[in-house]
């Protein structure tokens, strides 16, 4: 019988998507095959303290904060020097805990922007999902679009602002540029529609800019696209595959954080999408091309708008897509014939394969001294 792999699922974190991260992690833990894996949770609280929860059933039954308070979650630190045992107890005994592969499910800041991936690289650990560079590029939405546009991939147009930029007259200039007064003001590096605000007037624009700068030091302005919100899941390393597309049908004015997570009737999500075969294939091909262009690996969800005349536009790339019970990434693969348990198996295999390939690369170049 093969030895079980020890999988550490990371969740929580110091971002506005902390709670969503926990829900994603719970769904992953509940789905991973306990016959194949030894599962532990690494919980990062709101102030950045790390805890280990080695009883998955406790994590599924209680909130991580509750487990911290009652002592079931052990405080840990990062231990360098032994990749097989990266977590070290802070309880005084110095015990170290194993991990064969890490499944990061920390959404947003410090989890999806390359910071956590950099730490895992330093620990020499296999981990699921995009590497440092790809994570950083995809977290910065304006940088993502710059790269994709340079590669010929159609994207929603945008304008970037920093707090140092003058905003007087910007709204009118953008109205003239795009021919619409309906715009979106959004944080450059946040997800789950946090700090994403629709505006229709210059007064609303000014207020929205001020509000979004409370969350991020750069923002994007985009024309509002009156089209269908389509998503496509991508899976793989060197030869990625695309799922059948899914669709988000918001019942609010737009697909806000509240519509996503707080209002049970905030939106309808479906994997039975009424698109022509040609548009479906176009979406899948663009999703794969975008994935490869920013050098993603493992997984990503590519979000699109499809206009009434069937023009396909990329909106963004999400390198740690949600895995909650309503999340589209696993649902799209389920509709494509890949059930979630098998999807998780493949993601772990892809992570380990990539790590093994990286280990073959020459990292030290020995320069022989030239004899004088």
From Swiss-Prot:
One of its GO terms (biological process) is peptidoglycan biosynthetic process. It catalyses: 2 D-alanine + ATP = D-alanyl-D-alanine + ADP + phosphate + H(+). Cell wall formation. It comes from Coxiella burnetii (strain CbuK_Q154) (Coxiella burnetii (strain Q154)). Its cofactor is Mg(2+); Mn(2+). It is found in: Cytoplasm. ATP binds at residues 176-231. Belongs to the D-alanine--D-alanine ligase family. It holds the Pfam family Dala_Dala_lig_C. GO terms for cellular component: cytosol. Mg(2+) 1 binds at residues 303, 316. Its EC number is 6.3.2.4. This is D-alanine--D-alanine ligase. PANTHER family: D-ALANINE--D-ALANINE LIGASE (PTHR23132), D-ALANINE--D-ALANINE LIGASE A (PTHR23132:SF25). It comes from the Bacteria. Residues 145-349 form the ATP-grasp domain.
């Amino acid at each position: 019988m093969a030895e079980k792999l020890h999988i550490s699922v990371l969740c929580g974190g110091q971002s506005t998507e902390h709670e969503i991260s926990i829900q994603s992690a719970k769904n992953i833990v509940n789905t991973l095959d306990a016959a194949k894996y030894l599962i532990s949770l690494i919980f990062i609280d709101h102030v950045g303290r790390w805890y280990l929860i080695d009883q998955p059933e406790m994590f599924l039954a209680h909130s991580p904060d509750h487990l911290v308070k009652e002592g079931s979650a052990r405080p840990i630190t990062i231990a360098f020097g032994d990749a097989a045992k990266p977590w070290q107890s802070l309880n005084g005994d110095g015990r170290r805990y194993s991990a064969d592969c890490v499944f990061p499910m920390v959404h947003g800041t410090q989890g999806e922007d390359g910071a956590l991936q950099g730490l895992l690289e330093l620990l020499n650990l296999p981990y699921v999902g995009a590497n440092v560079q790809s994570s950083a590029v995809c977290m910065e939405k304006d940088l993502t679009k710059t790269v994709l546009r340079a590669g010929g991939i159609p994207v929603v147009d945008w304008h970037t602002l920093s707090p140092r930029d003058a905003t007087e007259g910007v709204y009118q200039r953008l109205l003239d540029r795009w021919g619409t007064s309906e715009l979106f003001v959004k944080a450059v590096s946040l997800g789950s529609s946090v700090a994403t605000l629709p505006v229709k007037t210059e007064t609303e624009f000014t207020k929205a800019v001020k509000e979004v700068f409370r969350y991020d030091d750069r923002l994007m302005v985009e024309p509002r696209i009156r089209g269908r919100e389509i998503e496509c899941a991508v899976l793989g390393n060197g030869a990625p595959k695309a799922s059948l597309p899914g669709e988000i049908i918001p019942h609010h004015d737009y697909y806000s954080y509240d519509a996503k997570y707080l209002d049970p009737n905030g939106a309808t999500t479906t994997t039975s999408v009424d698109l022509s075969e040609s548009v479906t294939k176009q979406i899948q091909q663009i999703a794969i091309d975008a994935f490869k262009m920013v050098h993603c690996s493992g997984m990503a969800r590519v979000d699109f708008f499809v206009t009434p005349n069937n023009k396909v536009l990329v909106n963004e790339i999400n390198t740690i897509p949600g895995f909650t019970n309503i999340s589209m990434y696993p649902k799209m693969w389920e509709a494509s014939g890949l059930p979630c348990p098998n999807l998780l198996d493949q993601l772990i295999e892809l992570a380990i394969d990539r790590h093994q390939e990286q280990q073959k690369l020459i990292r030290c170049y020995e320069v022989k001294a030239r004899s004088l």
